[in-house]
Amino acid sequence: MALLHSGRFLSGVAAAFHPGLAAAASARASSWWAHVEMGPPDPILGVTEAFKRDTNSKKMNLGVGAYRDDNGKPYVLPSVRKAEAQIAAKNLDKEYLPIAGLAEFCKASAELALGENNEVLKSGRYVTVQTISGTGALRIGASFLQRFFKFSRDVFLPKPTWGNHTPIFRDAGMQLQSYRYYDPKTCGFDFTGAIEDISKIPAQSVILLHACAHNPTGVDPRPEQWKEMATVVKKNNLFAFFDMAYQGFASGDGNKDAWAVRHFIEQGINVCLCQSYAKNMGLYGERVGAFTVVCKDAEEAKRVESQLKILIRPMYSNPPINGARIASTILTSPDLRKQWLHEVKGMADRIISMRTQLVSNLKKEGSSHNWQHIIDQIGMFCYTGLKPEQVERLTKEFSIYMTKDGRISVAGVTSGNVAYLAHAIHQVTK
């Protein structure tokens, strides 16, 4: 009690001599966070919120990055339902996973990405850890670079890139740079610009590459272009950091979608790789991903794994178990794996079909523009080439929602609304 009274006395004395201190203490007591400003809304979530408020029966949400069936409904893969039933029947426990995750899931993920007969897997010169989907894989990778990549803090991102790449690497303490990627004049790959910029990247820097289905443009290099990019990356001694969120979902063929990653490794480039099962298995809310580092030898891989575990432990201790069990069950069960590959191809084919139907309907509308880029691009997203003012008209006049850069999620297009979309686009572009 004496201490309490003496503390009040000293506080009163301080306030008497320094009125400002009393005011500061009072403000602090009322709110520790008065200085915190309102953050900007997420642009994609903002699109969804505006869509929900719209009462137009023909409204379309082309901003969401999740697959929809041809009725515009969320889609749970039948193979996932079967895997869930098998897991439930085993009456498994809910104990913690190891820090690195479910071992059989990690092994199966590496095999899916690199190919089952890859020399890297046979020699054991790799490490794969389970992560909290692709975002978690990127953050673990970025944090590993920040702590152990001693050559440079610079990470070169394609321009444009997925919006979350920037804060992930920035918040991990890396410095952000860019290289040319998308050509707005052709709505295609700026191969010349990309090669010129990559050639000028300082040696021992990090370059981020989208393995397939580039987000947000849907523009991918062709195999011969990938070969030249790999040559430049190797010549300049750059570290290749691959983000592969759409394996199988881009072309419908998982091996084709992983071609660039495998080619780089074949050329002697020891890459790291982020994987996600959100899109290709529809496990969005399960948060299932993996991070792989290809090393010089098995001994180096063990050292890298030990440090990845040390990074993971204070972040989230260990990853969630349910989604990893689902993915692992599918990948390691021959019948389920075969069914899943068929379903992935079905999703990819529907998106490819919607691209073709959209262009066909634009032609029927009498559009004189060249829309071939919509067909040439690949994956869930499409850079339409629409200008911000045209996007605004689509929203106001037709209740069609997308981000201001004209990016659309083709998964939101169905056989029931593709004609309406084509009509609206024609009206704002003619």
Curated annotation (Swiss-Prot):
Residues annotated with Phosphotyrosine modification: 96
GO biological process: one example: glutamate metabolic process
Signal sequence bounds: none
Matching PROSITE patterns: AA_TRANSFER_CLASS_1
Broad EC category: transferase
Pfam families documented for this protein: Aminotran_1_2 (PF00155)
EC number(s) stated in the UniProt entry for this protein: 2.6.1.1
Catalysed transformations (reactions): L-aspartate + 2-oxoglutarate = oxaloacetate + L-glutamate; L-kynurenine + 2-oxoglutarate = 4-(2-aminophenyl)-2,4-dioxobutanoate + L-glutamate
Extra facts: In eukaryotes there are cytoplasmic, mitochondrial and chloroplastic isozymes.
Protein name per UniProt: Aspartate aminotransferase, mitochondrial
Lineage of source species: Eukaryota, Metazoa, Chordata, Craniata, Vertebrata
